């Protein structure tokens, strides 16, 4: 029986959890850290605020958010891979971040009331969900009016020449890195597939608006290899 996308993604991340952080750095040539840092600068997270990190994985962005909201704030990280969460919990415990809670859950059905968080983020996770729009609407539902929904994700470069090189890298080189460093050729082939079919920057910006967000900002990184999308939930009328 053929696996659903959700089942396949779950299997992938359960298997690569112990090598995920190392491979993130290898695949992006360490650029993912700079992308997240610049995204956090644009977000301008306020101390004492409440944040949700959807598809938090091993909790790197969750931890960055915790530093921004401080001890008076609260950050919830949610992921459906228990193995990825286990790695994240070890980091959170080592840093003694009492303002962080990590939950096992599904991005398609966020277990929170409407209008709960000031910021809702998803980093390198939206391309892996079964329905992009449904998850964006869920994120919009749980963010407060005036709050921000942010996606940091791989994208589709538009520069001629660079785009072709990017496609070749993701299709052929990245799975080889997965085999060399994580013994996971098949799993990293999936990451290539999910990235290659993900919407481009303009299309994703339109999806943010269709999900009910306004004042959508788009920030490309490294010639469009990745991009930040940020939208604001309209104030209640």
From Swiss-Prot:
Q: Which class of enzymes does this protein belong to?
A: transferase
Please name the pathway. Answer: Quinol/quinone metabolism; menaquinone biosynthesis; menaquinol from 1,4-dihydroxy-2-naphthoate: step 2/2
For this protein, the Enzyme Commission number is 2.1.1.163
Q: Is the keyword 4Fe-4S in the record? A: no
Reactions performed catalytically: a 2-demethylmenaquinol + S-adenosyl-L-methionine = a menaquinol + S-adenosyl-L-homocysteine + H(+)
- What GO biological process terms are annotated to this protein in UniProt? menaquinone biosynthetic process; methylation
Under the heading InterPro entries, the entry gives: MenG_heptapren, SAM-dependent_MTases_sf, UbiE/COQ5_MeTrFase, UbiE/COQ5_MeTrFase_CS
What keywords were assigned to this record? Menaquinone biosynthesis, Methyltransferase, S-adenosyl-L-methionine, Transferase
Q: Which GO terms describe its molecular function?
A: demethylmenaquinone methyltransferase activity; methyltransferase activity
The keyword Transferase is annotated on this UniProt entry:
yes
Q: Which domain of life is it from?
A: Bacteria
Instruction: Write out the residues that bind S-adenosyl-L-methionine.
Output: 58, 79, 106-107
Say which family it is in. Belongs to the class I-like SAM-binding methyltransferase superfamily. MenG/UbiE family.
Q: Read off the HAMAP family from this record.
A: MenG_UbiE_methyltr
The protein's role, per its UniProt record: Methyltransferase required for the conversion of demethylmenaquinol (DMKH2) to menaquinol (MKH2).
Q: Which protein, by its recorded name, is this?
A: Demethylmenaquinone methyltransferase
